[in-house]
């Protein structure tokens, strides 16, 4: 397979890059002055693309690479891949589900706890020497709080299971009601927000879920409510979130993703009731290796004419 051209769209993981280089003829997108230079020189050599949640395979890339057979994404989310165009051209698409579910669910709970118990602010309080001047203020408990989850898929279900361990009543919103669950279902996000204290975004990004957290939803959640986003930045209308936090219409937020990463609204940086993370939901050594192995396994399966491990298209 050493002669098969594979395009890596951006730096992702050292192990993945090393293994791609060993097993295939690797092209690194960032080694070229522009996309046009890459396409002009190697359009007929590239048969596979490895993308992620930042750079995938858009219509321009798909059209520019006529020999492309498969896109293997180093992510679960596929919003950076033109799936319609891939289907039209018979290009296979894979992702990395399941292997990152536990890490992302763990992080969601960590964000909830950090936001409610002001863990980051408490840490700064000790480091700054403020503790010597007096005790830290009281915070809010998590146990028993009602948790609403948008998207009860693999990750949403794992979050619900963890929250149950804190005696939290669970409710959810999904495209359809899930059979076999005892959680309360709400057909609209506004209804869900009106009936929970912590609202967690765990759904896929689609045109329908873009800005699913908007002014109406935030107002329904209320001034004591907390938004947790471990989905995609575009799930949240960021200007509306910022204004709600500034005006006290929302109690707090724990955010792992943002609309225009790595840029974060300036106003959020000074807020102690907001916890900000640099999109690290799956960011553990173990999980990133598992994700890389899944990408590699899908590529090898495709080029050996074997069934794909995690086919999407």
Swiss-Prot record:
pH effects: Optimum pH is 7.5.
Active site feature: 232, 261, 279 (proton donor)
EC number: 1.1.1.26, 1.1.1.28, 1.1.1.79, 1.1.1.-
Reaction equation(s) it catalyzes: L-idonate + NADP(+) = 2-dehydro-L-idonate + NADPH + H(+); L-idonate + NAD(+) = 2-dehydro-L-idonate + NADH + H(+); (R)-glycerate + NADP(+) = 3-hydroxypyruvate + NADPH + H(+); glycolate + NADP(+) = glyoxylate + NADPH + H(+)
Keyword set includes NADP: yes
Pfam families: 2-Hacid_dh, 2-Hacid_dh_C
Segments forming a coiled coil: none
Key word Ribonucleoprotein present: no
Top-rank EC class of the record's enzyme: oxidoreductase
Gene Ontology terms: cellular component: cytosol
InterPro entries registered for this protein in UniProt: D-isomer_2-hydroxyacid_DH, D-isomer_2_OHA_DH_cat_dom, D-isomer_DH_CS1, D-isomer_DH_NAD-bd, NAD(P)-bd_dom_sf
Keywords: NAD, NADP, Oxidoreductase
GO-annotated molecular function: D-lactate dehydrogenase activity; glyoxylate reductase (NADH) activity; glyoxylate reductase (NADPH) activity; hydroxypyruvate reductase (NADPH) activity; hydroxypyruvate reductase [NAD(P)H] activity; NAD binding
Record note on temperature dependence: Optimum temperature is 37 degrees Celsius.
Binding site for NADP(+): 152-155, 174-176, 230, 256
Subunit structure and binding partners: Forms homodimers.
Function: Involved in the biosynthesis of L-tartarate from L-ascorbate. Catalyzes the NAD(P)H-dependent reduction of 2-dehydro-L-idonate (2-keto-L-gulonate) to L-idonate. Can also reduce hydroxypyruvate to glycerate, glyoxylate to glycolate and pyruvate to D-lactate. Prefers NADPH to NADH as proton donor.
Family: Belongs to the D-isomer specific 2-hydroxyacid dehydrogenase family.
PANTHER family named among the record's database cross-references: 2-HYDROXYACID DEHYDROGENASE YGL185C-RELATED (PTHR10996:SF178), 2-HYDROXYACID DEHYDROGENASE-RELATED (PTHR10996)
Protein name, as recorded: Glyoxylate/hydroxypyruvate/pyruvate reductase 2KGR
Organism: Vitis vinifera (Grape)
